[in-house]
């Protein structure tokens, strides 16, 4: 199998995410803020710490960024001149009504009543909460975070019963 053929099998299109919207937008490094998002090593991250070093005799002040990958939880760091632009991911969060679990995927219902079947069942504590709510027959919503063509379930919240 050729490398080109292999690549073709791994190409995915994510038209449904936000067709026409850019996955990232540029922002000057000095304008980034703790709690905001940034792309480091081609991964969407949330900034957990940042510090600025003074301008040295050879140029610009540098900004040291410490961030957590919003999908894997891995810590990433970057150092950039304060005047340079960094990419900021467009991060979107949508709540879907939970329907059921189908093997390793969540079956969710969007606001139009359409089924969404492409969100993987999360791992760890969140998976336990989803399974418990499902067992108890509760109505609940799953928060799905989307950025740079990836998406993942990030939290759950019980529906408020208005009787």
UniProtKB/Swiss-Prot annotation:
Name of this protein: Eukaryotic translation initiation factor 5A
Pfam families for the chain: eIF-5a, IF5A-like_N
PTM summary: Lys-57 undergoes hypusination, a unique post-translational modification that consists in the addition of a butylamino group from spermidine to lysine side chain, leading to the formation of the unusual amino acid hypusine. eIF-5As are the only known proteins to undergo this modification, which is essential for their function.
Subcellular locations according to the entry: Cytoplasm
SUPFAM superfamilies reported for this sequence: Nucleic acid-binding proteins, Translation proteins SH3-like domain
Keywords, in A-Z order: Cytoplasm, Elongation factor, Hypusine, Protein biosynthesis, RNA-binding
The gene coding this protein: tif-51
An individual GO BP term: positive regulation of translational termination
Hypusine modification, residue list: 57
Stored SMART domains: eIF-5a
UniProt similarity note: Belongs to the eIF-5A family.
GO MF annotation list: ribosome binding; RNA binding; translation elongation factor activity
UniProt keyword annotation of Signal present: no
Cellular component, GO annotation: cytoplasm
Protein's job: Translation factor that promotes translation elongation and termination, particularly upon ribosome stalling at specific amino acid sequence contexts. Binds between the exit (E) and peptidyl (P) site of the ribosome and promotes rescue of stalled ribosome: specifically required for efficient translation of polyproline-containing peptides as well as other motifs that stall the ribosome. Acts as a ribosome quality control (RQC) cofactor by joining the RQC complex to facilitate peptidyl transfer during CAT tailing step.
